[in-house]
Amino acid sequence: MQRFTSPLLCHIIRRGCFDAASKRQCLHYLKVLRSLQHSGFNTVFLGETDIPESLITGEKTAEETSLRWPVWTLVHAASHQGWVPWRHKLLLRVDLSTHLQNAIFQELCESLTMSYGKCVIVTRDKMQPMHVGAEEGKEPQLGTLPPATPAICMSSVESCREAARANGHELLVVPSSYNYLYPMAVAWSSLKWFIINNRKDFALRSIGNNSSYRCILFGDLIVKGIEKMTPNKWKVVINRVKKWENYYLDTLS
């Protein structure tokens, strides 16, 4: 029995320590977020999602599992008022060099300064796995889709934090066990379901003598999908996030 009970006890102790540490991390995150908000910082959520070719075409290929197969990455940000007035970035993931990633983040910071003044930019660490649910409960989603790739696309949270502060902003990372405090997953779900349901309407077919071609208006498809996440929908989603924030501030304090 000794060899069986010891691993079990060890698992319970480790899990308990992890949960306690996770709760402290969440409370610290929420207190810092509230402090910045009370100091006049506007909250902006920054995220990214990968869009595989099969999602666009509706045709799955064996080559898509290869790391060399091209995957598009969409980067955007939003506030309680809706998508921020900044042109989203749609790039091939292989083209996202460190220099380009930093340039994108710098451009966003400058745009936020012009539109909102000082902001607290909330994102997920690129090393964090994305969990749709959480231990205490699950947020309803718009549908079941493959998990989003971790954000942020920027090479280093620390370098982005320095860039944010240089522009008068602050950067916060949502604790990994509380990703439903991060509303971008709902927006990406909305976008991808729009792509699935409407991709045929954005495809043109040309038939020649010996072959046929299909042209997909990819950029237009993405823009229309983004527009489906309206300011009113953003308001509902972020109000839900605020309720969770208030709940954990009360229960974890």
PLM features: residue spans?
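Short functional hotspots at interaction and active-site rims
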Residues: M1-S253
